[in-house]
Amino acid sequence: PVHLSKKYDLSISLEVAEHLPESSAETFITSLCEASHVVLFSAAVKGQGGVGHVNEQFLSYWQKIFLKKEYYMLDIIRPEIWNDEKIPPYYRQNIVIFVYVDTYKQKCGKNQENYCL
């Protein structure tokens, strides 16, 4: 994984992970988590197709890897953009946020509202 000297406000990986071999998946996610406690993420799902896609996976696959790193998934973007045809379909389908559990608890406390970040 990439080790940085500090954390950033946001780590972003949009439609990149599917281009890396499955053997690199956990290392890649670890690098994103090393960069920030909040990760904006999307990756091609199985059957999406595309040039150079070698590791298309359902979202649950990525969610399990992030959960090993103690990152919760927040699905707060897709409902807002689902019907916006100006946004490419693969973003509308695949984009989510992962947040480190302690950051989530600090920002949201007992508030279950996903928009508390």
What is each residue range found by the language model?
Residues 3, 20, 47-52, 82-86, ...:
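Short catalytic/ligand-binding loop motif for oxyanion handling, primarily in non-cytosolic enzymes
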Residues 1-48, 59-63, 98-100:
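Conserved SAM-binding loop
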Residues 9, 56, 86-96:
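Short, surface-exposed amphipathic charged segments that create phosphate/polyanion-binding patches used
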Residues 91-117:
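Flexible, glycine-/basic-rich loop-and-beta segments that form/coincide
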Residues 71-83, 95:
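Conserved S-adenosyl-L-methionine
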Residues 54-76:
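Short alpha-helix
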